[in-house]
């Protein structure tokens, strides 16, 4: 979970690997035992985005209106704004309008979603129905933008439906869907991997005659944690449906356009650095009279860098509403955004252990080699583009399908140690 101030948290460093056991010592004659290999360091924790702890109040609902003349539904109120740990409130729905004689009917607009840790959803537009004149559905409210690291944008509200009667000379125009809110960038990086454990020392050769045992290899460093992902964009609202009771040339039904999907956000935190390799154990000493010293253990390989956080996905475009005479316009998916950069590889491995001293007749053991550097972490994946909304069906002219959003770019790989 992220910190209470809404900043999210970098991953914590992994624990160090256990040291290898020492080799046994020979008594008067014989070779010393080899030291054990050091344990692997623990992986660093992944970076985390904050988790909202509450939601602000929703906006008020617009009032419905039914009149013999012009009828206009009330607009929905905007959702209250949240803060770094509180999501925005949902927008209120627009009021419905019904004209029972020869007036126009206009549905109320949906309220905008509040901005906050996560964006609030937009309110739906009010529906409109007129017996003898035009009917215009209310537009859906826009989703609120996210304002905390890794937060997701709110979904757009649906457009209101529209219906005109058989005796009406006017058109039915449904409301458009609201646009989705944008996601917010993430910043938390992955934690550093833990250091590998030290290799165990080789055992001493026999007091008089015997070779010293080889030192154990150092443990491998832990892998760095992944960066936190960027926030996704909210989906666009669907357009409302329009309908006329008969398909006369003077009466056309226009389905509402789907809303534009919100943009996904970038992951700016890097993957954590790989842990350093453990130091190789020292070789055991040879016997006092005859015996070679044990070789020092090789240093452990450094851990690989963590993967950069992935970019947030773009929100899907809303579907166009259907119409009995004419379809809607196009809906566009939101663009994906850029993935975070990969973390750097761990530092070169620790120094190898020292070779043991030789006996009166015998040579000293060779020193252990230096451990290899860790591999660079992979770049974070780019966010996927949102899908375009489908065109609504029309009995004479179908609506056009929307275009999909563009995918985000992948992050750059980290440097090797």
Q: Across the structure, where does each feature detected by a protein language model lie?
A:
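Glycine-centric low-complexity repeats
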Residues: 1-417
């Amino acid at each position: 979970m992220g910190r209470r101030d809404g900043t999210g948290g970098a991953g914590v460093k992994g624990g160090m690997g256990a040291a290898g056991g020492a080799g046994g010592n020979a008594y008067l004659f014989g070779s010393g035992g080899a030291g054990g290999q050091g344990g692997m360091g623990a992986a660093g924790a992944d970076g985390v985005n904050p988790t909202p702890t509450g939601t602000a109040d929703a906006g008020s609902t617009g009032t419905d209106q039914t009149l013999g003349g012009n009828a206009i539904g009330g607009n929905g109120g905007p959702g209250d704004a949240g803060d770094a740990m509180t999501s925005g409130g949902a927008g209120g729905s627009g009021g419905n309008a019904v004209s029972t004689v020869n007036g126009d009917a206009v549905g109320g607009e949906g309220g905008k979603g509040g901005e906050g840790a996560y964006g609030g959803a937009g309110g739906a537009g009010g529906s409109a129905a007129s017996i003898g004149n035009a009917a215009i559905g209310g537009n859906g409210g826009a989703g609120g933008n996210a304002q905390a690291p890794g937060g997701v944008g709110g979904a757009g509200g649906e457009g209101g439906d529209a219906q005109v009667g058989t005796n009406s000379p006017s058109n039915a125009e449904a409301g458009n869907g609201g646009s989705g809110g944008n996601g917010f960038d993430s910043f938390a990086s992955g934690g550093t991997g833990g250091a590998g454990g030290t290799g165990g020392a080789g055992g001493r050769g026999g007091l008089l005659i015997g070779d010293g045992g080889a030192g154990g290899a150092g443990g491998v460093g832990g892998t760095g944690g992944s960066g936190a992902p960027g926030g996704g964009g909210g989906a666009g609202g669907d357009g409302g449906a329009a309908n006329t009771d008969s398909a006369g040339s003077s009466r056309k039904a226009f389905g509402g356009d789907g809303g534009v999907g919100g943009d996904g956000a970038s992951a700016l935190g890097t993957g954590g650095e790989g842990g350093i390799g453990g130091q190789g154990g020292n070789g055991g000493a040879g016997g006092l009279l005859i015996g070679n010293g044990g070789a020092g253990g090789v240093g452990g390989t450094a851990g690989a860098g963590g993967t950069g956080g992935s970019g947030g996905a773009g929100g899907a475009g809303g579907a166009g509403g259907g119409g009995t005479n004419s379809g809607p316009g196009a809906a566009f998916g939101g663009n994906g955004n850029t993935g975070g950069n990969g973390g750097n590889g761990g530092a070169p491995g620790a120094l190898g252990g020292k070779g043991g001293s030789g006996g009166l007749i015998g040579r000293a053991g060779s020193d252990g080699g230096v451990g290899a550097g860790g591999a660079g972490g992979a770049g974070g994946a780019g966010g996927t583009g949102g899908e375009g909304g489908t065109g609504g069906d029309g009995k004479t002219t179908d609506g056009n399908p929307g275009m999909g959003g563009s995918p985000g770019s992948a992050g750059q790989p980290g440097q090797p140690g």
